[in-house]
Amino acid sequence: MGFDLATDLAARRRQHRYRQARIMDGPSGRHALLGGRQYLNFCSNDYLGLANDPAVVAAFQQGAADWGVGSGASHLVCGHQRPHQQLEEALAAHTGRQRALLFSTGYMANLGVMTALLSKGDAVFQDRLNHASLLDGGLLSGARFRRFPHNDGQALASQLARSEARRKLVVVDGVFSMDGDEAPLVDYAEACEGHDAWLMVDDAHGIGVLDAQGRGSVFTQGVNERVPVLMGTLGKGLGTAGAFVAGSDELIETLIQFARTFIYTTAMPAAVASATLVSLRKSREENWRRDTLAELIARFRQGARALGYTLMPSQTPIQPLLIGSDVDATALSEALREKGFLITAIRPPTVREGEARLRVTLSAAHEVEDVDALLAALAQCQTQDV
């Protein structure tokens, strides 16, 4: 058949799974401007409301004035500028680790770690609901790829016990991006320690949000010193862009030498690093942002439960409404959009068959009135049989 792309695209349309980017005409914050209309935005990952914070924006502008809008090269050529170094040192201190290394995206960080640490003869063990970048990194590493049931520490321990691999790496999300629940990191740390394995945690959705200082899930669960590899992103709780890996001096040196996604790509703009230095400090010091989030999460969950919606076991800003069919999830998303709310319907293959959902995300930029308005709109959709 060759490259029959039209057939593939037509099939995706029939499945109600055709993706299209919406062109936003303003910044992504509490509100979103789309097609000349302003919406309340409940699908951004800007959990702490830092993406449009005046101090963070000012730091970005000053960074661009001082360092230009591009780094000009990879880190190992001439693209590693002073703000990059300062941010790596700040992230290492923030996460209680010897060193940290910047990557352009979380996807590249995850691919870089696994392809640098693993090869044929090794094994990687992953939660079935891990992010696509973790799954791709495991497959690309050349290691034997094993998946265990979601959040099942006993199943993981059993797989580790049977493995005779040279190196064993367990990889999990700290907070799962589509369900919002947290991994049982204590169970995983114990399983790894009992079977000579390393634990890697992708805390993309925990950094900035969890822990009294925003240090993430490894701190809330008390396992930071038991997790050799920590990955975090800068574009969610911290409001900027990019990612980092934090760990021992030997780990970071290994990534510098062998992580192709670090070596062979242009460094992030120094202006982004400058802005992140400010957002990192604010995320650590401004506890009111996490307090606001906790209040909004509790209010939304109570209201959605009272309306009869099926919630996931999440206490994080990710609050999915489990709908079921792709058609119903899309219809509810569109109905809410007509009422002035922007919430994306998440469908397979991102989530499992029959588990399409509305991924509601809350931000410290939201007001209590915003959550109440969303709950009222959901109630109206029920009366309109949507």
UniProtKB/Swiss-Prot annotation:
Keywords: Biotin biosynthesis, Pyridoxal phosphate, Transferase. GO terms for molecular function: 8-amino-7-oxononanoate synthase activity; pyridoxal phosphate binding. Its cofactor is pyridoxal 5'-phosphate. It catalyses: 6-carboxyhexanoyl-[ACP] + L-alanine + H(+) = (8S)-8-amino-7-oxononanoate + holo-[ACP] + CO2. The modification N6-(pyridoxal phosphate)lysine is found at K236. Its EC number is 2.3.1.47. It holds the Pfam family Aminotran_1_2. Signal peptide: none annotated. Pathway: Cofactor biosynthesis; biotin biosynthesis. GO terms for biological process: biotin biosynthetic process. Substrate binds at R19, H131, T350. It is an enzyme of class 2 (transferase). Pyridoxal 5'-phosphate binds at G106, Y107, S177, H205, T233. PANTHER family: 8-AMINO-7-OXONONANOATE SYNTHASE (PTHR13693:SF100), CLASS II AMINOTRANSFERASE/8-AMINO-7-OXONONANOATE SYNTHASE (PTHR13693). NCBIfam families: bioF (TIGR00858). Belongs to the class-II pyridoxal-phosphate-dependent aminotransferase family. BioF subfamily. Catalyzes the decarboxylative condensation of pimeloyl-[acyl-carrier protein] and L-alanine to produce 8-amino-7-oxononanoate (AON), [acyl-carrier protein], and carbon dioxide. Homodimer. This is 8-amino-7-oxononanoate synthase. It comes from Alcanivorax borkumensis (strain ATCC 700651 / DSM 11573 / NCIMB 13689 / SK2). The lineage of its organism: Bacteria, Pseudomonadati, Pseudomonadota, Gammaproteobacteria, Oceanospirillales.
